[in-house]
A protein has these predicted regions:
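Feature for exported/extracytoplasmic and membrane-associated proteins, marking the mature portion
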Residues: 2-306, 310
Length: 311
């Protein structure tokens, strides 16, 4: 039974799914050349959960007087900003990321936003994942919609000889909504490639000719697909190695990026990886009163900076 048929019959799919939002044609085509199986380019998305204070991370130095008026209790001291350009600087704990910038390996895109911003963490995350406008609600992710244009029959008959590896991998316990398609998520969740166990297929004898039997068959096929992807992930993990010695054991994000680096080095053909760093909903703990360049936000930015540099 095809997954599309199952979804149509399932009571959980009574709400229609829309494919609106940002059109694929509106996105620079070269951005998606990484999905070409003949290319060795890989897209790694790092999602900062909780609402990162971008103005204290990437600081517009030419607007410092205005920032001082708007946020005097949390603004970074002007003399501690790490200069990138004449008008732009980084938080002082992000020296590693500045080194990446100075080496010509970091580009910055500013003013990425949308009209009528929503101040809710939850709704803003939905908009980020789906690339919807502030006035529409979508149930498909922006990467999922694009992947669906290329592989509309997924997950039926996947993996196969042409595409033996997952299209996307989310490092964590749950797949990323960014990769959600109409009837399937194109991402595979992975916690630890060193500790993968095959899932038991829930079939014992013939299945009844009923909706229940169809659902069990669908579940079984999903588990078979997961086990097949896990096999390819384990193979790449066993072959991979990490040249960098900068991955700190006490850095959560670095450990996730280390997994990504190892799978890439091991030859896994997955083109998209999603990793997340949480804790950015800092509120009063964002900065220390006696030194605004320290505090919870500074700790997270340091973790982000050192992890990216190691990767």
């Amino acid at each position: 039974m095809k997954r599309r048929q199952f979804i149509k019959r399932s009571s959980a799919a009574t709400v229609p799914v829309l494919l609106g939002g940002v059109q694929v044609s509106a996105i620079n085509h070269s951005f998606f050349n990484i999905l070409n199986s003949e290319s060795d380019r890989v897209l790694v998305l790092i999602q900062l959960d909780g609402g990162n204070d971008g103005l204290n991370m990437l600081i517009p130095k030419d607007q410092y007087s205005n920032l001082m008026k708007a946020r005097p209790n949390i603004i970074i001291p002007e003399n501690s900003i790490l200069d990138l350009t004449d008008t732009l600087g980084l938080h002082p704990v992000m020296q590693d990321l500045k080194t990446v910038f100075d080496d010509g390996k970091l580009n910055i895109i500013q003013s990425v936003s949308y009209p009528n911003q929503n101040r809710s963490h939850f709704r803003s995350t939905d908009i980020w994942n789906t690339a919807s406008s502030a006035t529409e609600n979508l149930t498909t992710g922006w990467l999922g919609r694009y992947l669906e244009t290329l592989y509309p029959d997924y997950p039926t008959a996947y993996p196969n000889a042409a595409f033996p590896d997952p299209f996307a991998i989310t490092i964590g316990t749950a797949v990323s909504p960014t990769c959600e398609g109409t009837t399937a998520n194109y991402s595979t969740a992975l916690v630890n490639p060193d500790n993968i166990s095959a899932l038991a297929v829930p079939i014992n004898g013939d299945l009844p000719d009923s909706c229940f039997g169809e659902q069990i068959d669908f579940l079984a096929q999903s588990i078979i697909q997961t086990n097949a992807y896990n096999d390819s992930i384990q193979t790449a993990n066993n072959k991979g190695n990490n040249i960098s010695t900068k991955y700190a054991d006490d850095n959560e994000l670095a450990n996730k990026l280390k997994i990504v680096a190892k799978l890439i080095a091991g030859g896994l053909q997955t083109k998209i990886y999603i990793v997340r760093l949480g804790g950015f909903d800092n509120h009063a703990e964002q900065v220390e009163a006696n030194d605004t360049s320290t505090g919870k936000h500074a700790e997270l930015l340091n973790e982000l900076s050192t992890a990216i540099c190691a990767f």
